[in-house]
């Protein structure tokens, strides 16, 4: 019983000391594509998002990214949103949330701008 109490106290302390989220405003064309989506956004899903939301960013959740060891950002969640913003609002910045760090560099991965339709 005492051990269970100690483990819960340790969990509580870890929750308090979590790193605060890091938000950045970046050009979506410069974000690197994940290895699971090297060709970019799914064209059907992209057209569906364009038809539904157009160039609006209202209510759009942040794009989740990881920071590579070289400082480059690679998309974890939001390839279609990033592509839509890069295509319809070139030069505008989008909000991303850095959710973690990678040990490997990401510079060799293609960017959203490289794969714009």
Where are these regions (language model features)?
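A short, basic-hydrophobic beta/loop patch
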Residues: 59-116
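An acidic, glycine-rich, mixed-charge low-complexity segment common to nucleic-acid enzymes
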Residues: 1-23, 32-44, 109-117
């Amino acid at each position: 019983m005492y051990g269970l109490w100690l483990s819960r106290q340790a969990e509580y302390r870890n929750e308090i000391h979590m790193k605060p989220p890091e938000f950045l405003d970046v050009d979506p064309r410069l974000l690197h594509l994940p290895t699971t989506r090297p060709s970019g956004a799914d064209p059907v899903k992209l057209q569906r998002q364009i038809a539904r939301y157009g160039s609006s960013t209202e209510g759009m959740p942040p794009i989740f990214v990881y920071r590579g060891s070289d400082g480059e950002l690679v998309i974890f969640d939001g390839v279609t949103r990033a592509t839509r913003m890069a295509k319809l609002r070139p030069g505008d910045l989008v909000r991303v949330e850095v959710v973690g760090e990678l040990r490997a560099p990401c510079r060799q991965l293609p960017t959203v701008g490289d794969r714009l339709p």
